[in-house]
Amino acid sequence: GDDRLNSRTFLRRVSKFTDKVKPVKSDFAMLDAQDSTVNRQLLLAAQILKSIDRDMPIRFLIAECDQASIVLSALALARYYGVEDQLDISPLFETPHALRNGGRVVEQMLEQPAYRNHVKKRGVIAVQTGFSDAGRFMGQIAAVLAVERLQSHLATAIAESGLTDMRALIFNTHGESNGRGSHPGTLTQRMDYIMSPWVFERFRSHKIALTHEFSFQGGDGFLWFGDDLLGEASLMQLLCARFKPTDTATQDEFYNDADFVWDFYNEVINQQDSLYHDDDYRYVLSGFARNFLIPSGSRPEIRQASGPLAQSTFTPRRIRAIPHNAILQQLAIPTNVIFGIGRAGRIDPNRFNMIFRNAPRGRTIMDMVLGSWQNTQLQVLAAYGDFQDPNFWISRAIAQGKKPTRWQYRLVAHQLYHRNANHSGLLWSAFRHP
């Protein structure tokens, strides 16, 4: 089980095994014969270093990583294919389990001699955090708090390991659950949202060099870098955001009331989890709104599943992040950002009001909630509900009189009667929780 894979004994065995691995010669024939994704990627890296650029560093991303043993195994394979010296292994923490336990995973990685020796050679400790996928799993607001906590734990783990002469590299994939670049504020506010001044101060206080990477993808790039003047202005905002003083960040009231923030965080997660398990919410996302979307890439919108999951009912967690966000925007109800905030605030309304109205970090987070709420239109959702109500189509059929098209309306109504048999009502019933 997972506990055994995370045990100190097992990790030490993997570390010792990694030290004993000898590199093999590889070629394109080996690459062509491989079916395993990880082997193909590392073999491709080997051929790039061999035939194109032997000095180029390569970032090796491990998606949905939640165990130190996975990183050590990737390191063993990198050594086997002879690419260890040019490879920075970057685990991506994006699932709820990974974000909650990412700090411990980093600690376990840094405890193992094989990994320590590797990062000493490379001079870099690289990780990646996912915002948009995390928002799909646990809600955007809980995700941003979990990501910040993980970033802080990384600084602590590096300091405690004695590797403060290494450079920490954090790449944030900041979809923010409303789409690329959806933060409602300025670029400076956006940068503070994905990595707070408090986190920068944590690394600075430990004397750890920090490289913060982020990307502008798709339309987000055109929005901020559409011409030379706009690009220069955007770069100036980014520089101002990253070189402003951070020494006062520790005085933020948001960090001085850890008990309330922790309770708030857990309640948002609980509310989001209850939403994902709501049958009516599943009904919403599996409706025809998904068919109105423009394809967002070469990958299918629904993740492929195997084993028992493949036979289970539809679950929102199987929708990829981009179409999931787009579906909620199509329905005008960005629940992955706003849902559960009110319930969490009821824990202590006075503290909630003070922290999220007055504390700088709290305001940064609440700006995202309020921006998403402005994009919420319950009338649009109700209209979709009418479309999935068979009575609506029956009324349309009656209005057709004796026209042949009346049978088309009746067919739609018939299909919806069967589809709705196991559900409690209209589309908007999924949002009955206040």
Question: Whereabouts are the PLM-identified features?
Answer:
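Long, structured ligand/cofactor-binding scaffold of large enzymes
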Residues: 46, 69, 79
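Short helix-capping segments at alpha-helix termini
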Residues: 80-84, 161-162
